[in-house]
């Protein structure tokens, strides 16, 4: 008899848990929240957030530690739950930002990214995993957030923000967080936020440094007030080119989340007219005051000339992508493909292979027959490296019995720096060094890894 009672009580407890789970799912559906976010591939109109006026017992338990803060309290938590935030970019900044906004109980999160998860993302983009490689980043992030806090409405967008869709999308959210990694998108997001009167919380991270500020908020400047003219494309470095220590975008993304939550809960914003700069090497923060909104600004000034979105790729002279840009500095005759170079190796044709990558990249991988002279050394004409080049060319000329100019092939990671090196070497040929014919290996070592040697490391 006792065993029967224990068994029945156990079954009853299990059924009660099932009923509680079903009630929770029903509540989510009634609030317009689905367990598995549906991926959006175009911008559609969203239904208004169901406004909360109080906290239930689960809310009080979940957010109890931040409810105890006098700066937030119940009023602030309710305000957070009634706010929607659009995160532009689900990468190194967007992942920690979205994670902490969801954990704090933001009402709706729009997650926008047109890219898919790659292995090289995982050291810094902490919402993605090995199992989500190949998935759209927006969907991967939304699913991770839904597992963490199912009460947050996640709307993943697998699309590229453009002049055609930005206004329609941004006007459906209360706050925008720019986590993008390219200049055209920054101008696009800024202008759309100004035209829709949305505050813009912007951050960036590169190498071991980060920056944070808030644009278009309570009379503060917009991005164009500070940067009316975009930088030359060749001066812009991104994570693919310059690298980044994973924890740095993590720090900046968390600070971004803090500013969003302060705006959402009605607290004073710290960086509406300040720029926070983080030096990860020294572990130091410093803040500098920014100039105020500019009367002559073309988008937020007294007489704006930009009243609709532009062609930002044309304006900036670069593509709206965080992928490495491809330079086209040489003629077709000055370049060879990796297949052509493989043929040169197979035929044992005498030549010099010059690797112009920085030493830190050469330490990762290299072709065994290459001579390493960094591009920077060629640009600065460092005597020790010019001497090294002269000796290598001289040795090869002796092997050829001085019958023809030495063939020099230049390689780098992607075929950009190698083109610059070819131009420098052609100017040196016959003057600072003996005559040579110089050609670039198109696509660089990453093309070699993809098309010739599948075991060669990619980075």
Curated annotation (Swiss-Prot):
Annotated positions binding Zn(2+): 222, 225, 297, 300
Molecular function as annotated in GO: ATP binding; metal ion binding; molybdopterin-synthase adenylyltransferase activity; molybdopterin-synthase sulfurtransferase activity; nucleotidyltransferase activity; sulfurtransferase activity; thiosulfate-cyanide sulfurtransferase activity; URM1 activating enzyme activity
Catalysed reactions, as listed in the record: [molybdopterin-synthase sulfur-carrier protein]-C-terminal Gly-Gly + ATP + H(+) = [molybdopterin-synthase sulfur-carrier protein]-C-terminal Gly-Gly-AMP + diphosphate; [molybdopterin-synthase sulfur-carrier protein]-C-terminal Gly-Gly-AMP + S-sulfanyl-L-cysteinyl-[cysteine desulfurase] + AH2 = [molybdopterin-synthase sulfur-carrier protein]-C-terminal-Gly-aminoethanethioate + L-cysteinyl-[cysteine desulfurase] + A + AMP + 2 H(+)
Active site per database record: 239, 412
Residues engaged in binding ATP: 92, 113, 120-124, 137, 181-182
Pathway(s) annotated for this protein in UniProt: tRNA modification; 5-methoxycarbonylmethyl-2-thiouridine-tRNA biosynthesis; Cofactor biosynthesis; molybdopterin biosynthesis
UniProt cross-references to PANTHER family, sorted A to Z: ADENYLYLTRANSFERASE AND SULFURTRANSFERASE MOCS3, UBIQUITIN-ACTIVATING ENZYME E1
UniProt similarity note: In the N-terminal section; belongs to the HesA/MoeB/ThiF family. UBA4 subfamily.
Protein name: Adenylyltransferase and sulfurtransferase MOCS3
Gene: mocs3
């Amino acid at each position: 008899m006792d065993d029967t009672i224990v068994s029945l009580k156990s079954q009853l407890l299990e059924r009660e848990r099932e009923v509680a789970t079903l009630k929770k799912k029903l509540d989510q559906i009634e609030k317009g929240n689905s367990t598995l976010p549906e991926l959006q591939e175009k911008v559609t109109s969203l239904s208004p957030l169901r406004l909360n006026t109080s906290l239930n017992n689960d809310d009080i338990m979940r957010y109890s530690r931040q409810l105890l803060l006098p700066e937030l309290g119940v009023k602030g938590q309710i305000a957070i739950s009634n706010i929607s935030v659009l995160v532009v970019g689900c990468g190194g900044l967007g992942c920690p930002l979205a994670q902490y906004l969801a954990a704090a109980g933001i009402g709706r999160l729009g997650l926008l990214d047109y890219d898919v998860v790659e292995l090289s993302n995982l050291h810094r983009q902490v919402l993605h995993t090995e199992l989500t490689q190949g998935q759209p980043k927006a969907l991967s992030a939304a699913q991770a957030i839904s597992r963490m806090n199912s009460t947050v409405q996640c709307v993943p967008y697998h699309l590229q923000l453009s002049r055609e869709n930005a206004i329609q999308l941004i006007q459906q959210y209360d706050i925008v967080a720019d986590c993008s990694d390219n200049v055209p998108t920054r101008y696009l997001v800024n202008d759309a936020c100004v035209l829709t009167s949305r505050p813009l919380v912007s951050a960036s991270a590169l190498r071991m440094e980060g920056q944070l500020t808030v644009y278009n908020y309570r009379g503060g400047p917009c991005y164009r007030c500070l940067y009316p003219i975009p930088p030359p494309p060749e001066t812009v470095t991104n994570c693919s080119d310059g690298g980044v220590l994973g924890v740095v975008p993590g720090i900046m993304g968390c600070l971004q989340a803090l500013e969003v939550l302060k705006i959402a809960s009605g607290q004073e914003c710290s960086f509406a007219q300040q720029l926070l700069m983080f030096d990860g090497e020294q572990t130091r923060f410093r803040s500098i005051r920014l100039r105020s909104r500019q009367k002559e600004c073309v988008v937020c000034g007294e007489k704006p000339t930009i009243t609709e979105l532009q062609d930002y790729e044309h304006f900036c002279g670069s593509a709206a992508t965080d992928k490495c840009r491809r330079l086209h500095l040489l003629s077709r005759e000055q370049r060879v493909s990796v297949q052509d170079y493989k043929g040169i190796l197979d035929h044992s044709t005498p030549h010099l292979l010059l690797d112009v990558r920085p030493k830190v990249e050469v330490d990762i991988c290299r072709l065994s027959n290459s001579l390493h002279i960094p591009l920077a050394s060629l640009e600065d004409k460092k005597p020790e490296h010019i001497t090294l080049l002269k000796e290598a060319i001289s040795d090869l000329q002796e092997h050829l019995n001085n019958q023809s100019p030495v063939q020099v092939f230049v390689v780098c990671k992607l075929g950009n720096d190698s083109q610059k090196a070819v131009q420098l070497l052609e100017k040196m040929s016959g003057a600072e060094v003996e005559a040579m014919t110089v050609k670039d290996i198109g696509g660089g070592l990453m093309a070699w890894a993809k098309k010739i040697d599948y075991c060669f490391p990619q980075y």
